[in-house]
Every structure is written in C-alpha cells, then in structure tokens.
Design a protein with these regions (language model features):
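Cytosolic, long alpha-helical scaffolding segments
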Residues: 1-302
Length: 302
C-alpha cells in the first residue's frame, strides 16, 4: 500500500496491514475514590483508548456522575455515547489521521498569548475580575494539551501515523516538551493574574507592564521559531531574556524603595515578578528546542 505524506514523501506499507482494533477499557465503579476514577479516565484518554466504559457494580450517584461528565468534557473528542443508571460509555470520535500536531500547538500558543495579553491590559486599566476569565481559558489550554499528548503518544506507538503527521522521533519528543511548556505557562499566567489586582502603585504598574510586554514578544518568537525551525529567532529569545532580567531587577529595586505599607502588596509584587520569570523561562526553553543549523542542513563537501 502506498500513501503520500504531508511533506509529499511516499510511505510503503504491506498490503495485508490490518486496520487496528478499537481500543477499549473498562473502569470499575465505585473505585478507591471518585478522584482515582477520574484519573483513570484521563490516563485511558492519554493512552489512546477509543472507548472508555465506566462499569458500575451499583448505581452511579448523581454527584459522582456529574464529576465524571465534567472530567470527560475536558477531553477533546471524547463524547458520551450511552449511559444508564450504572454505566457510562464514552467514545473518542476524532480520527487521529486528520489531526495536526502543529495546528494544536499553534492553538495552545494562541490561547496562552491571549491570556497573557488580556492580563497585562487588565492590569494597566485596573480592571477587576480578569483573573476569573484567565482561569477559564487556562482550562481550554489543558484540553488542547491533553489532545496533543494523546496524538503524540499514538504516533510513538504507530509509525504509520507518525509518518502521516510528518514527525520524526525527535520531533515527537520536542512537540511533547513544547506543549508541556505552553501548558505550564498557562498555569503561571493564571497565578500572575491573581497577584496583579493587589498592586496599585503607578510606577510599579509601569515597570511590570514594560517587562511583561517583552515576555509577550518572547513567546511569539519562540513558538514561531520552534515550528519553523528558525534558529535566528531562538537566539533573539535568549537575548531578550537577558534584557527582561534587567527590567525585573529594576522592578525589584523600585519595589524596595517605594513605600508599601501593606504586606499583601509586597507579597503580590514578589509573586508577579516570580510568575513573569517562570513564564519567560518557558519561552526560553521552547527556543532551546530549535535545532541548530548544522543539525538541519546537509554538510558541505560531505
């Protein structure tokens, strides 16, 4: 069997290759706890199971049923196809061959970028309630992250799928790491958004916003560089991180010289600085995944 891959290369497979059986798993209810059962659902999803059955020895309580449904709603492509008093059957309805790791990563990056931009804008305008909006979007980042991890794990176990996705073994590993950094950045931004409303000093707001704007550009360059394998942008991110550190140190100096009478404000400044640094480090780490030119280009006179 001959198949054309996304990079226009051709893959040959034995003509007698059989279609893979649908992967199914049964999870007993009640388990040790509802939290343990939900973790099993997440684990089965990430391991690539197509059908996940919750098998009850007794009726599934209303509260537990709602928690199970809430957990399943967090998993892209997983839909409840049947249920009764003691059973819940869900199925993954997306075709892995139609998914694209790059598009999912870009989607994650777009959501995270929007979270960060709105956090800074809300901070500048001193708007209330922005942290709740950010937290809800962080949940969507997690959903996309789980989908990408599922796809990557499936590709690791299925060379045919990996070939269709145009991903080498190293690419698969790099996408997994990059996605993890994006997911972590979403969590750090949620922490960042929680700390900012407490800060009200004009000079501190100005300096934190200045440093924060630099982090925004770092994300754009690191993710674009990673996807396009552009080492130049990777080097720019590292240089920008050095400049960012200078701005952070300046913010720390201002905070020590500024008369802050509330302990909560002092703690909020420290949390915001610490959170911004963790976010920036995520972009540096993604930039570090970009292969050097000598690993992506053929050697001359070889």
């Amino acid at each position: 069997m001959i198949e054309v891959n996304r990079n226009n290369s051709i893959s040959l497979y034995p003509s007698d290759t059989e279609t893979e059986d649908v992967k199914e798993v049964n999870i007993p209810y009640p388990g040790l706890s509802i939290e343990s059962l939900i973790n099993q659902i997440y684990g089965a999803y990430l391991l690539g199971y197509d059908i996940i059955r919750i098998r009850g020895k007794s009726l599934i309580s209303f509260d537990d049923r709602e928690l199970i449904k809430l957990a399943m709603r967090k998993l892209v492509g997983l839909e409840i196809v049947d249920e009764d008093g003691s059973n819940i059957i869900s199925q993954f309805l997306l075709d892995a061959n139609t998914l694209d790791a790059e598009k999912i990563l870009r989607r994650m990056s777009s959501i995270v970028a929007g979270m960060y931009k709105d956090t800074l804008l809300g901070f500048q305008k001193r708007e209330n309630g922005i942290e709740k909006l950010i937290a809800s979007r962080d949940d969507e980042v997690d959903r996309q992250y789980f989908l990408l991890v599922r796809l990557i794990r499936s590709a690791m176990m299925d060379q045919k799928l990996a070939s269709k996705l145009n991903l080498s073994n190293i690419d698969i590993l790099d996408y997994r790491i990059a996605a993890n950094h994006l997911e972590s950045a979403g969590d750090y931004i949620a922490d960042f958004a929680t700390a900012l409303p407490i800060i009200s000093h004009d000079k501190l707001i100005k300096e934190i916003t200045h440093a924060g704007t630099l982090v925004e550009i770092m994300q754009e360059k690191s993710v674009a560089g990673f996807i396009n394998k552009n080492r130049v942008e990777s080097n720019e991110v590292v240089s920008m991180y050095a400049k960012f550190n200078e701005l952070l140190n300046l913010t720390k100096e201002i905070s020590t010289k500024t008369e802050i009478y509330k302990q909560d404000t002092t703690i909020a400044v420290l949390i915001s600085i610490f959170s911004m640094d963790k976010i920036a480090r995520c972009w540096v780490d993604i930039a570090d995944l970009i292969k050097p030119v000598y690993l992506t280009a053929p050697l001359k006179n070889a």
